[in-house]
Amino acid sequence: MIPILRASDAGELKRRVMNRSQLQNEEVSRIVKEIVARVRQEGDAALFDYTVKFDHVTMTAETVLVTKDEIARAYAAASPEWLDAMREAARRITAFHEKQKQNTWLNFDPAISLGQKVTPLKRVGVYVPGGTAAYPSSVLMNVLPAKVAGVKEIIMVTPPGRDGSVSYPLALVAADLAGVDKIYKVGGAQAVAALAFGTESIPRVDKITGPGNIFVANAKREVFGHVGIDMVAGPSEVLVIADDSANPRYVAADLLSQAEHDPLAAAILGTDSETLAAAVQAEIARQTALLPRRDVIEKSLTAYGTIVVAPTLPDCADIANQIAPEHMELSVADPYGLLPLIENAGAIFLGHYSPEPLGDYLAGPNHVLPTSGTARFFSPLSVDDFVKKSSLICCSRAELERVSEQVMLLARQEGLDAHANAVAIRFGKEIKA
């Protein structure tokens, strides 16, 4: 049963939640470093060797690329209702991310014109896990912001099944709907390395996004600096702040929707109501017994599920800001009144009819969110992740001459005489021997 704690015990809760990540594993790190180094040096030979070793299937340069026929077969396996829902999700995700676009701007001035040039990345790679973890919704969330940003080429990698086909065909449909240009049947750390450095079959990308297991996450961290990455995601979490206006059945259902993800997922309720805390605790027990993934749910709730009773809602907000959850629900009578107190959260769901699964699939904002407390300094995946920005400076001769003495003074103060000379030489004041 999910425990009920007092606010004074929230420090222990924070420690448990923040320490869930399994990324700090020396043996995994060693294996990943070896895989990345081999793929970087040997290209396809190493990539396909690891595919045989880990996925138990032989791939070649001729078979690794997903064909149009494979995509057509995937469409045939999709129900019309699911396709309609995916198209609606894609429409909403695209519309939301269109509002994030920034254009190049330049403030023209006779003295000095300043601005910023916004340029889409040339090529992006999206990692999609295999099997039951190949969520088509994640394909949309990773690809559509890149399309909105204007990325010229988007390629996807996903592990093959033992028969050589993509292990979860609906991921192919999602990729096609989102506008992926090429899909390769490779997975694991070796696929991340192929994207980062390129092989004979797979082109090098500028950035890698998408979720994966501990090997994929470590591989992304290993190649960061050679390419950009979205983030190194840890286990998922939700924190619900609720008062007496909340329906305990709804709150319990929302907590369980997170707990069913993974034994490492954290589902937390913060409330100022003893009555609600007890009612939600009972509802969680009742609903868990009805759910097919109850084994996962029970492990998650036993390890990381908690109900915290605090004196006031602002106290709940303070606890929430310390945890900095991936998802936060404000299931209170006045969510907009509480919102200014929330500083650290990946996504915030306001009111009794904004459950976290709505954001997972159809609302429009991105569901790729900072986890494990990183909402203190990271943001959701967005259009900004798929562009780069260059500063623009165009100075007139008169303006440069006007500020030249100050520029040269600052340069010389830092011991950089060549910097000062680059200004001085334009006005007959260059350094003399």
PLM region descriptions:
Residues 107-173:
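Conserved small-residue-rich beta-alpha loop and adjacent elements
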Residues 321-433:
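C-terminal core of ALDH-fold dehydrogenases
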Residues 1-122:
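N-terminal Rossmann-like NAD(P)+-binding subdomain of aldehyde/semialdehyde dehydrogenases
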Residues 105-108, 126, 156-158, 182-188, ...:
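General beta-strand structural signal in soluble alpha/beta enzymes
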Residues 141-152, 176-178, 196-203, 220-222, ...:
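Alpha-helix C-terminal capping segments
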Residues 179-257, 261-266:
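Conserved NAD(P)+-binding/catalytic subdomain of aldehyde/semialdehyde dehydrogenases
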Residues 231-303, 307:
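A conserved active-site cap/scaffold subdomain adjacent to cofactor or substrate pockets
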